């Protein structure tokens, strides 16, 4: 399988998706036809989200079609060489994808050679479940099971920092809560600017920041760019 799972879409001082464009270009391998899944968009319309994505990827020769615009979404997924899943609210993304019957077809198409690109919520959707999203559950997705393309759970935008005087849980504390009730899981705390690239059966960590791996009953382990999962 070919996956590009990004923690986030924007870095300080850079345009939207700018840091990801070289990664995307490197993994295209001649692919040009893409379907975009915009359902995580809440404060922007799906048309706006699709158009923005199409504009950014056009210089790479990628032709982007919003899945909500086609008459036959299943046929569009089957024909797609690239499946792009944008960030936003993970619960809405999963709900809309499930209700349209897109989860199994997307997973099957990626397993048969389509490139999967997802950032933030889109990275969450590639995991076994969305249980490590940071998002507010604004809708009920009728279950947390997702695409299960990547075997570990990703927590995008990972940071353990708290604002001064803040008394809420750290991100690690929230992840530890999950591991109490689901000790079989492994969670990757993927900070902004980092990504996981899967190609030719190898999953490789990239980015400038330290990534953390959490397992039940174990200390967190720090990983740097180049680590192979």
Swiss-Prot record:
Looking at its record, which EC class is this enzyme? Answer: hydrolase
Alphabetical list of CDD domains matching this protein: GAT1_Peptidase_E
Q: What is its main location?
A: cytoplasm
Catalytic residues (UniProt):
120 (charge relay system), 135 (charge relay system), 157 (charge relay system)
Q: What superkingdom heads the lineage?
A: Bacteria
Q: Does the keyword Plastid apply?
A: no
Q: Where does it reside?
A: Cytoplasm
A single Gene Ontology MF term assigned here is: serine-type peptidase activity
Function of the protein:
Hydrolyzes dipeptides containing N-terminal aspartate residues. May play a role in allowing the cell to use peptide aspartate to spare carbon otherwise required for the synthesis of the aspartate family of amino acids.
Give the family from UniProt: Belongs to the peptidase S51 family.
Per its record, how is this protein called by name? Peptidase E
The organism is Salmonella typhimurium (strain LT2 / SGSC1412 / ATCC 700720)
> Top-down, what is the taxonomic lineage of the species of origin?
Bacteria, Pseudomonadati, Pseudomonadota, Gammaproteobacteria, Enterobacterales
């Amino acid at each position: 399988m070919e996956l590009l799972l990004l923690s986030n879409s924007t870095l300080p001082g850079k345009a939207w998706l700018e840091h990801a464009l070289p990664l995307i270009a490197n993994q295209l391998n001649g692919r040009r036809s893409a379907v975009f899944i915009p359902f995580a968009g809440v404060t922007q319309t799906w048309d706006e989200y699709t158009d923005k994505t199409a504009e950014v990827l056009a210089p790479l020769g990628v032709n982007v079609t919003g899945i909500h615009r086609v008459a036959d979404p299943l046929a569009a997924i089957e024909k797609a060489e690239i499946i792009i899943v944008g960030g936003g609210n993970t619960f809405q993304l999963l709900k809309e994808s499930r209700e349209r019957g897109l989860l199994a077809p997307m997973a099957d198409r990626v397993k048969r050679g389509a490139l999967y690109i997802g950032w933030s919520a889109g990275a969450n959707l590639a995991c076994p479940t969305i249980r490590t999203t940071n998002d507010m559950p604004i809708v009920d997705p009728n279950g947390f099971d997702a695409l299960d393309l990547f075997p570990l759970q990703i927590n995008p935008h990972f940071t353990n920092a708290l604002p001064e005087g803040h008394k809420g849980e750290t991100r690690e504390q929230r992840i530890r809560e999950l591991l109490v009730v689901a000790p079989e899981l492994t969670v990757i705390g993927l900070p902004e600017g980092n990504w996981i690239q899967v190609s030719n059966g190898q999953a490789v960590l990239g980015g400038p920041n330290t990534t953390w791996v959490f397992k039940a009953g174990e200390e967190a382990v720090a990983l740097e760019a180049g680590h192979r999962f």
